[in-house]
Amino acid sequence: MQNLYVNVTSLDSRAVDKFALSEEIMMEHAAIALERTIRERFVLGSSILIVCGSGNNGADGLALARLLEESYDVILHLPFGASSPLAKLQLKRLDALGIKSERLPKNADVIVDALFGSGLSRPLDSATVKILEALNALQGFKIACDVPSGLYADGTLDFHTFKANLTITMGALKRGMFSDAAKDIVGEIVVADLGIHHTHYEVPSQWHLLEASDLRLPLRTTATAHKGTYGHVAIVCGEKAGAAVIAGSASLRFGAGLVTLLSTENVPLPYELMLSHSLPDNTTAIALGM
């Protein structure tokens, strides 16, 4: 299973303190991860629209523009200026290269959203909404830097959230990207390392993403094993039995030896499930199928 985080501010601070990284080093690696993905997927000379916010997520985008400017047709759009120290530094570097902010084009091969990262906590203002509407209307391949702008840490999202084909999230997976609401706007998800491998960057989390390897069925190697060897699951039925029947069938498929549904009614069941009006004495696990 993989760790999920509501935000990674504390992980960034830990990387600075424990591994002597700097915010600028981590930002450069974030930009390199974006650059590498674009170089792997798009031919040289493609038009790359990079839309940057005024903070550090925008600074990632500014650094990306610097890395791509010689090989691609980079179109930089910086609607709100640069406010964070690192954004100002990245903008100074672009100024030295002669790269200036331009108006939004009518189209581009690639659209990079670097407006807001996972720290967004306020409603989107009308100016931002207008920009996101314009970006979503473009036909190019859409990449979100860290998270799609408009997606909040709790997994809720603004109606105008950037609809990405690919999200390159920085450092670690964010919990909000796996909410039901986010499924249609994050696209493919790639985690970018920020100067150290993610196993060093991460710390234990109370939130996890299950993987197929976590769902291994019991290994039945004993020749004398029988249905009583692998536990007895009791599932309490609600007013409607459908959920309990589905849970019971899933329990058997996952390896439970016996499954009994508890109900005050005589519920019709598949032959492999048992029905009882009281809790069996040999129950080893209880679930609510409601």
Where are these regions (language model features)?
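Short secondary-structure transition/capping segments
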Residues: 88-89, 155-156, 270-272
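Structural alpha-helical scaffold elements that stabilize or flank donor/cofactor-binding regions
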Residues: 104, 160-161, 279-280
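Short gly/ser/thr-rich secondary-structure transition/capping motifs
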Residues: 94-100, 148-153, 214-219, 272-274
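Nucleotide and nucleotide-moiety/phosphate-recognizing core
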Residues: 35-115, 123-145
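Internal gly/pro-rich beta-alpha loop/helix module
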Residues: 109-110, 115-205
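Small-residue (G/A/S/T)-rich helix-start motifs and N-terminal tracts that mark the onset
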Residues: 1-71, 75-78, 166, 177-290
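Short, ordered loop/turn segments at secondary-structure junctions
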Residues: 79-81, 147-148, 172, 264-266
